[in-house]
Amino acid sequence: MEYQYPLDLDWTNDEMMKVIHFFNKIENYYEASVKGDEVLNAYKNFKHIVPGKADEKQIFKEFENKSGYNSYKVVQEIKKNPNQTLFSKDFD
């Protein structure tokens, strides 16, 4: 699937890489599987770059519109299942 990640050109290269890394973890959830702690660590880094809830919602919506992947759903599922290690859309 070809699409661009929702990035802010005011971010540093390091910040852009952290946001892309987070979205890569979301892609892994939908396309294969991913460890919950990896997603939460990537999300924590994402939140340092995008601390505002409104900005987060906008970026998540842009990503979902382009990719079809719901970042919010993935993060919430992982937070609700702290004892589970591996996550995938096929596991729900």
Curated annotation (Swiss-Prot):
InterPro entries, A to Z: BH2638-like_sf (IPR023324), UPF0223 (IPR007920)
SUPFAM superfamilies: BH2638-like
Pfam families, per database record: UPF0223
Coiled-coil features, chain-numbered ranges: none
Domain of life: Bacteria
Transmembrane segments: none
HAMAP family xref list: UPF0223
Family assignment from sequence similarity: Belongs to the UPF0223 family.
NCBIfam families: PRK04387.1
The protein's name in its UniProt record: UPF0223 protein SERP0684
